[in-house]
């Protein structure tokens, strides 16, 4: 979001995202990151076919051991609002990202996208946001023998923190929500609470 003048996740021309040209740049970025020492590449753009192109480029450049974490299930969600506000892209974005991010009312599409990304070379997959999509995390875990990660995004964090600050709930809700990800089948969780949780465990 913060690295473009328009707030979208790819190259924009005539109000349309150029899928293939965006993938070319993502592939170049992946090689640069691998050369810098990254063990895992995690493209979150949601362009069609990018996992296959990145995997081929990594292998061609002798980075076959670099893994790919695909944001295979990334929904066009209102839960990203606080992040966009924090990085200054909230007012940049014209329109929405529904043409390339997933429809939150669609369940089956998630499984199709995960299957495609695994076929293209993904080593693990992300479901983002996390809490509103516990059913999707469970579906992915049941249907694929691959690590699945949950992303507790900025909107989830803000809702929880604001509720704690106003005395509506106690901070045990943090552990409850994170446990729900594990119960649904997540192998790992990305959360803004990670540092505080690590200190208290």
List the predicted regions and their residue ranges.
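Alpha/beta enzyme core
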Residues: 1-201
């Amino acid at each position: 979001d913060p690295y473009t003048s328009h707030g979208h996740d790819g190259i924009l021309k005539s109000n349309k995202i150029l899928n293939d040209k965006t993938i070319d740049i993502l592939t170049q970025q992946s090689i640069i990151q691998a050369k810098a020492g990254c063990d895992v590449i995690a493209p979150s753009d949601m362009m069609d076919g990018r996992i296959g192109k990145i995997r081929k480029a990594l292998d061609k450049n002798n980075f076959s051991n670099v893994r790919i974490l695909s944001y295979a299930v990334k929904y066009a969600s209102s839960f990203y609002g606080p992040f966009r506000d924090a990085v200054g892209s909230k007012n940049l974005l014209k329109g929405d990202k529904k043409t390339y991010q997933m429809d939150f009312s669609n369940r089956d599409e998630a499984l199709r996208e995960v299957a495609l990304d695994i076929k293209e070379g993904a080593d693990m997959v992300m479901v983002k946001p996390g809490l509103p999509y516990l059913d999707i995390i469970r579906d992915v875990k049941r249907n694929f023998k691959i690590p699945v990660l949950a992303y507790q995004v900025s909107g989830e964090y803000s809702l929880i923190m604001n509720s704690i600050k106003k005395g509506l709930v106690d901070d045990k809700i943090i552990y409850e929500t994170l446990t729900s990800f594990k119960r649904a089948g997540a192998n790992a969780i990305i959360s803004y609470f990670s540092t505080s949780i690590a200190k208290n465990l």
